[in-house]
């Protein structure tokens, strides 16, 4: 992550706002994305696809771009997916359904995602870049969580661009506190950390925040991210169920053991009675 990467995301946000207009529609501010439009970008999915393609071309289009920008910043893919997921989340339909539809129609079914990246051996196409990071056909994305991740990413990018302008950024301290608080809340949520895609996104955010913190440690004191103890109700419930299951199994085992021990005792007692009767019969026969 660096300021130049963030400037591309800021540019897209200016040309293609990350909120719907008053009519509930996605809007382009101008014709900046016309080279990425299919069918004139006459529906919402096509507009989002144009923005997504712009990002991949900006960072991964050929070997020179890949070497210059993306090779040491492969986490960019996570940020593109955060942007894509957030933009799709503005639709009324379920986010998971929108992601699967977008992947099948535009990524898997679109030649610009499947074309070979010139001069790159590590990844054959944009589609492979995505699939090595995220399985968009089998991921459970939540709109509110994606919104929080997107907010955290925007704060991080704001810090990168502001530090690039001024290494003694006075407002960055408050932004850093805001970012760390949001990150720790997300990282403390079991429903998030138990999701592979969310985990990768969180990992990229923390890695790039720590890089920024280390880079400007002499000029600014940014708060550290604390490791979070997950105490969600779901994890507690799971642990409680496990404990109850163990005690239940022990109880059943002890019950069976008691039953068999009692059965064995009764059996031995009957044998003893039979032996006593036989002794008495022998005594009478010998008299």
Predicted regions span which residues?
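N-terminal targeting/regulatory segments, especially signal peptides of secretory
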Residues: 1-231, 235
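C-terminal single-pass transmembrane alpha-helix
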Residues: 223-287
